[in-house]
Amino acid sequence: DFEYLQLVLTWPASFCYANHCERIAPNNFTIHGLWPDNVKTRLHNCKPKPTYSYFTGKMLNDLDKHWMQLKFEQDYGRTEQPSWKYQYIKHGSCCQKRYNQNTYFGLALRLKDKFDLLRTLQTHRIIPGSSYTFQDIFDAIKTVSQENPDIKCAEVTKGTPELYEIGICFTPNADSMFRCPQSDTCDKTAKVLFRR
């Protein structure tokens, strides 16, 4: 089984600076994934490999809005669902005893809905277009995550770490917060760019 769930939210402006996006980057965090994991050993591609069922209707629309497949043109993304399928087989497989495909994606949407990280950052005067210390970003997010979040950076331009993703962790049944293990991708001594 697994010890915690990490909801990973991507900042699209940074993602689309580092990757080629077919979708217009929304000005808010979008879901990258919901990752069941253990503190010591990383879990992925668990057996048995689940079968992915394609979403339609309301669930498709909700995912398209809140878990945007930024790299893919919208019609292709909605039909082929490459990002969701990949995430489900890689990560959803590791909590399939507890969550089936519908409950897994439903849970990710429900957990994302608990937080407005952009508003939280803005409340703490952390605004897209400027740079901030790692600690300032960490402390702002911790006001809503209660336990330690995992702030993830990417250094697309050498010497300029930028805020890329934020992980918020939960207990396996998602009823309380869990202290995220730290991925240590941010230079704690440098200013971190919050890309506009």
Curated annotation (Swiss-Prot):
Pfam annotation, one family: Ribonuclease_T2
Keyword Ligase: no
Entry EC number(s): 4.6.1.19
Subcellular location(s) per record: Secreted, Extracellular space
Keywords: Disulfide bond, Endonuclease, Glycoprotein, Hydrolase, Lyase, Nuclease, Secreted, Signal
Any one of the GO CC terms: extracellular region
Disulfide pattern: 16-21, 46-94, 153-186, 169-180
Keyword Disulfide bond: yes
Gene Ontology BP terms: RNA catabolic process
CDD domains attached to this UniProt entry: RNase_T2_euk
Chain segments annotated as transmembrane: none
GO function terms (MF aspect): ribonuclease T2 activity; RNA binding
SUPFAM superfamilies in alphabetical order: Ribonuclease Rh-like (SSF55895)
Residue positions with a glycan: 28
UniProt catalytic activity: a ribonucleotidyl-ribonucleotide-RNA + H2O = a 3'-end 3'-phospho-ribonucleotide-RNA + a 5'-end dephospho-ribonucleoside-RNA + H(+)
Subunit structure, as described in the record: Monomer.
Annotated family: Belongs to the RNase T2 family.
Protein's name in the database: Ribonuclease S-F11
Species this protein is from: Nicotiana alata (Winged tobacco)
